[in-house]
């Protein structure tokens, strides 16, 4: 490993020179995956060298400032407001009653924090409306969501004591509206839909979910952390006809990550609310100490200014034309990959992805090795029997792609799948990936190889 030979976690007695420090950092990075070469299909979103250079310059220019107090750094307050307003416009604020003036929101450190805040706001809304507990305070609020909804909602459930009611998706991997409606009761404060869901890249039936939530008198959050900065531009291109934003009646909040398809620096996300009344429930304020007013819009107190500045810069640098171009390039690359997968014997795409995220692996209808646990995994997968086998072992395919071309895909289950978040940086190498995939799929099928490592990992605690 690259870290071998380095001192064991000790502060050096004598400081090192800048060149030595930077050299050691580069040595440590030698085992990192090659995202610059388009080999990584998760975690990183690249709009090219020019954008990356801009992000580095703007983040460095604001490396010392602290967004904890924008009275000291009003530029940060202004940039945050501008990002929120631009995002609201992209997500339909200009087309709803009340217009952009009614849509309020905040920046967070990323999608997880945005989902935490949306859940916390829903819990507090339930309390303010006396929707739970009947005044006794003993009932536990709950949220209803599909098994495909992001894992961060489980963290929110744990942090804020909101019961998570996970409902199996249908065979198409989309939220089952009727089953979710059956799970709502007097203690429900939130219904969740995804645009798209991370695991299979499908957009949930948001109009139906939102209408159902509105009819039952509960809030509806759309998790567009993944799609918020690409779906609007695919819509402009006529490549997506789904309705999922604030133009859908009943949608009460939306989250969108600027550091994903907005191509900003990690980490900056936006969470928006349909009304000022809802938005006011998110921040925390107190004077109950000796240091004066303490206020924060999200979980953190100190917030780094670099991602805010870089996010603001990339929005204005790319503009609508730039985002439309990147969206089209990304969509074409994703469609090329999907077509290649579907043309290869023994492989299949999971569901019918709507945009630029997809999951694939061994075709369960082709016969052969067992590729997934299906509904046996505690009912977490989907309605229906997906336990058939495939001549191509999905994780052996992933191993072969890594060995042949250094390609990295997240592995997920159930069902066993390789996950591909296709972004603009992949457009130049998608042909190379398809060639390698074509070669190794045949080899894995012919040899009948099966991966020993069956682990699946989305995030680590290191």
What are these regions (language model features)?
Residues 75-76, 105-112, 145-146, 351, ...:
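Active-site nucleophile and cofactor-binding loops and adjacent substrate-binding regions
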Residues 236-354, 361-363, 376-379, 383-384, ...:
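Active-site C-terminal subdomain of aminotransferase-like
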Residues 6-7, 63-71, 97-106, 138-140, ...:
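Glycine- and acidic
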Residues 372, 421-462:
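PLP-dependent enzyme catalytic core of the Aspartate aminotransferase-like
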Residues 208-211, 215, 336, 396, ...:
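Alpha-helical scaffolding segments of alpha/beta enzyme cores, especially the outer helices
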Residues 1-101:
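N-terminal entrance/gating region of PLP-dependent enzymes' catalytic architecture
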Residues 106-295, 384:
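Conserved PLP-enzyme active-site core in the AAT-like
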Residues 346-434:
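Conserved PLP-binding catalytic core of the aspartate aminotransferase-like
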């Amino acid at each position: 490993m690259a870290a071998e030979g380095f001192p064991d976690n000790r502060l050096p007695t004598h400081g090192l020179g800048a060149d030595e420090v930077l050299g050691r950092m580069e040595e440590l990075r030698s085992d990192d995956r090659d995202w610059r070469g388009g080999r990584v299909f998760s975690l990183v979103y690249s709009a090219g060298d020019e954008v990356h250079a801009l992000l580095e310059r703007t983040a460095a220019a604001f490396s010392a400032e602290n967004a904890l107090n924008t009275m000291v750094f009003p530029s940060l307050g202004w940039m945050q407001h501008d990002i929120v307003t631009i995002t609201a416009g992209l997500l339909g604020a200009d087309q709803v009653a009340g217009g952009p003036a009614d849509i309020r929101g905040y920046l967070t450190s990323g999608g997880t924090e945005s989902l935490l805040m949306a859940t916390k706001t829903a819990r507090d809304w339930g309390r303010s409306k006396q929707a739970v507990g009947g005044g006794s305070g003993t009932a536990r609020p709950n949220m209803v969501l599909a098994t495909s909804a992001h894992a961060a909602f489980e963290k929110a459930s744990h942090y804020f004591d909101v019961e998570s009611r996970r409902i199996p998706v249908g065979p198409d991997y989309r939220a089952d509206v009727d089953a979710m409606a059956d799970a709502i009761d007097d203690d429900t404060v939130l219904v969740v839909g995804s645009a798209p869901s991370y695991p299979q890249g499908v957009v949930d039936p948001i109009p139906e979910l939102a209408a159902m939530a509105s009819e039952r008198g509960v809030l509806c959050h759309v998790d567009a952390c993944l799609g918020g900065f690409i779906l609007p531009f695919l819509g402009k291109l006529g490549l997506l006809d789904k309705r999922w934003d604030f133009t859908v009646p009943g949608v009460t909040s939306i989250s969108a990550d600027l550091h994903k398809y907005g191509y900003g620096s990690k980490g900056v996300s936006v969470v928006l609310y349909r009304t000022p009344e809802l938005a006011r429930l998110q921040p925390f304020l107190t004077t109950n100490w000796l240091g004066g007013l303490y206020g924060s819009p999200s979980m953190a107190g100190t917030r780094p200014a670099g991602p805010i500045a870089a996010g603001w810069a990339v929005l204005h640098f790319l503009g609508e034309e730039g985002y439309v171009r990147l969206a089209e390039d990304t969509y074409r690359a994703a469609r090329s990959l999907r077509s290649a997968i579907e043309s290869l014997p023994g492989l299949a795409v999971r569901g019918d992805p709507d945009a630029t995220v997809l999951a694939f692996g061994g075709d369960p209808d082709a016969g052969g090795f067992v590729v997934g646990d299906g509904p046996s995994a505690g009912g977490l997968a989907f309605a229906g029997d997906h336990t058939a086998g495939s001549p191509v072992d999905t994780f052996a395919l992933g191993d072969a792609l890594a060995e042949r071309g250094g390609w990295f895909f997240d592995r997920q289950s159930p069902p066993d799948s390789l996950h591909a978040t296709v972004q603009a940086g992949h457009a130049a190498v998608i042909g190379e990936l398809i060639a390698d995939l074509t070669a190794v799929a045949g080899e894995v099928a012919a040899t009948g190889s099966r991966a020993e490592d069956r682990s699946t990992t989305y995030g680590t605690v290191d």
